[in-house]
Amino acid sequence: MAVDVSECLAAEPRRAILIGMRPVAIIGIGKTAFGAFPDRDLRSLAVEAVRKSMESAHVAPGQIEAFYLGNFAGPSFVGQNHLAPYVASAAGIHGVSATRFEAACASSGSAFFHAWSAVAAGIYDVVVVAGVEKMTSQPTPVVTEILASAGDLGGEIKAGATFPALFAMIARRHMHEYGTTREHLAAVAVKNHANGAKNPDAHLRKVITLEQALAGKPVAEPLTVYDCSLISDGAAAVVLAPLERVAEFTDHAVVVKGIAQTSDHVALDEKDDITTFRAVRTAGEKAYRMAGVGPSDIEFAEIHDCFTIAEIIAIEDLGFVAKGEGGPYTAEGRTCLNGEKPVNTSGGLKSKGHPVGATGVAQICDSWLQICNQAGERQLRRHSLGLAQNLGGSGATCVVTILGAAA
């Protein structure tokens, strides 16, 4: 029977985008350690990650056809603009399109999405996607102010609200609506620190107890210092190529099965419900549909835990658990390394660190390590299908990527 393609595309608009697009693979990764590095500048961190990714992919700088850089606030943190060619040229990549992407903490996730789009569409074959941030060159109050610029200038920033304050409001509302407790928040921190302690590249390789997490220095009630991600320096990079060309470069490749970038209001008070991130739900739904899988098929996830409540909400919004069940699910140990749905095997932003412009690509790198059976002490038994979720602001941008082993 003949099929009316136009009817199919009308019923499934996302499929129209994908017709004629090529499967894309990650053929190499590279990253720096995350931490506080007073003797390193932004460019040296980014170049280290880029060069490592090209070495991993067995490609030379002259083979790179485009360069994508995620960076949130290089001009504010280190006073340098025009960052993409600044980094690309230092890594030996010349004469190609070099573009910086800014989407708050989802900057490199956004860069990855646009790089994937270009390779999938056949515009380029071999590209590098990097993310970098150098944050510790500024004192903490200045860093907090720079980060707050990803909020709403006319309301939140004018009122003096920082992101710890905004996520504290989110946490309080989630507690009110669903009975989430401080113990549930602390369980996220304890689990992620345990994972990060096994990650040689993590910023804070320190195991903590539930009691320590609960007794942490208050930041914004109910959040303590243990509920907040770290101020870090670091960089990460990947090399993308069409799946059909993988054999030319490597026998270690990971395929992008599904991907989506979505957006929502920047201001928290413009959202209908602050106990959910609509951008996460929408990106997850689109990525699942593209990959042809559902939440139950995902074997592990790298989740954007900028604050512990963000991880709890994300695993609910991504369909891993029902709304309101994220806290108990975590406290029961079901997201631990040996749990049914391991989350943040890298240590997450809480322990691995959060150089904001690097985080999205770093999540991709950590997922690649799991799928390629190279995660060391943190290696999972079930690791063929993973998900990375990168969030910007208080949920204004989200990139969800589903990654799987190459057949």
Regions found by a protein language model. Give the residues of each.
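Condensing-enzyme catalytic core mediating Claisen C-C bond formation in acyl metabolism
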Residues: I19-R43, L153, A187, P218-T282, ...
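Active-site-proximal alpha-helical scaffold in enzymes
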Residues: E102-E133, A165-K198, V238-E244, K352-A375
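Extended C-terminal subregions enriched in glycine
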Residues: F277-V280, E285-T308, D317, L349-K352
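Beta-strand segments within the central parallel beta-sheet cores of soluble alpha/beta enzyme folds
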Residues: P61-N71, A98-A103, V127-G131, E183-V190, ...
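Conserved active-site "lid/cap" helical segment
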Residues: L18-A106, H174-T181, H203-T209, A279-D297, ...
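Short glycine/threonine-rich loop-to-helix capping motif typified by GTGT followed
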Residues: G74-H82, L268-D272, D305-P328, G339, ...
